[in-house]
Regions:
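Ribokinase/PfkB-type carbohydrate-kinase core domain
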Residues: 1-196
Length: 197
């Protein structure tokens, strides 16, 4: 049902990258017609590799997923991730340039989907936020009870305001979920949070 393309940013040899991208493209013929194809972006060491991967795979993808750093690298500047007037143009740039119907971005403050049928991503965004927050506060010791406790935690107030403002400006084109308020966590795990998305 879902085909995730990722980890191309880990490849440092162009010949290997070209080979892996071509092998990935061949897999499309074996997917169900209604399969959802997701391209996971990355922080590429070799920036031209990112352009190549996007050029080759974006035409086949339904969702482009990235974190806040990858978003800012894409547009070539740092932005305030709690300022809708800065985030909206960034989303519009990625959406337009990639040609992918739906852009998913996860940050330390929120997770959002922008584009066609953004609302279909709400459960996935909420699940990603909850899983990342569970890992942040409990490391590898996540279990269903910890996940449920995390789901019940209050969100960051600034992120709630941001999501409300985004909805006011973009309507059905946006689905924005605030991250949990984890200011009380004294010994956080910060590695692997993005993998929740």
């Amino acid at each position: 049902e879902v085909f995730l393309m990722g980890c191309f940013s880990e490849i440092l040899d162009r010949d290997i990258l070209v080979d892996r991208v071509e092998k990935t493209r061949r897999l499309f013929a074996h997917l169900p017609e209604d399969a959802l194809i997701v391209l996971e972006d990355g922080c590429y060491v070799k920036k031209d590799f990112r352009y190549y991967v996007h050029e080759q795979l974006c035409p086949h993808a339904h969702i482009l997923s990235m974190n806040e750093d990858e978003l800012q690298e894409y547009i070539g500047r740092r932005i305030d991730i709690l300022d809708p007037d800065a985030v909206i143009p960034a989303l519009e740039t990625v959406h337009k340039n990639s040609g992918i119907p739906l852009v998913l971005v996860h940050s330390a403050a929120w997770a959002l989907a922008y584009g066609d049928n953004a609302g279909m991503m709400r459960a996935s965004l909420e699940g990603g936020v909850t899983m990342a927050a569970s890992r942040f506060r409990s490391g590898d010791d996540i279990n269903p009870q910890i996940y449920a406790q995390t789901a019940a935690m209050a969100p960051k107030e600034a992120a709630v305001t941001f999501c409300q403002q985004m909805r006011q400006q973009l309507g059905e084109r946006i689905c924005c979920v605030p991250c949990k308020d984890l200011s009380h966590v004294t010994n956080p795990t910060v590695v692997g949070l993005g993998d929740s998305f």
